[in-house]
Amino acid sequence: MRLFERILGARFEALAPEVQALHRQVGIKEGEISLRASPIMQLFGFPPPCKDAPLWFGTREEENVAIWRRQIKDRELRSEVWQSGDLVVERMGVVTITSELVIAHGALSQETRGVRFMDLPLPRALWPRVTAREWGAAGTYHFKIVVRAPIIDVVLLAYEGWLRP
């Protein structure tokens, strides 16, 4: 049983088949991504803006920690994802976000429950606003993520795309 199956338990079956497949399998998936990253996010390793760029997404699990690797253009983004009670935690570089997984109409979204920067907890007022949604359509897995700056509400990062099953 993989990470999201463990966290969601029986609720996992309510996900669209394409979303279930992505979170059940390890290995490499291919697809496309369109990305808009602010200069500050580019400093954190995100590539410059691109449209319909090739995307390779690889997953593996080591001792209950999922390793996610995304190859976008010439950049590789790596994150570690694990379970904390009924929440999912993802660390990418110096930022760690704890989220609740929510299922509606077969789609999966994440609601932020905590943010750490350089392992220090941030007060809620300083949390970035993250909207993350995954869904299936016509046999393909789709995703859309938007990260907005706290207080000033400016888009720091937005990306969306798809992966083949």
Where are these regions (language model features)?
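Soluble ligand-binding/transfer domains with enclosed cavities or grooves
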Residues: 1-147, 159
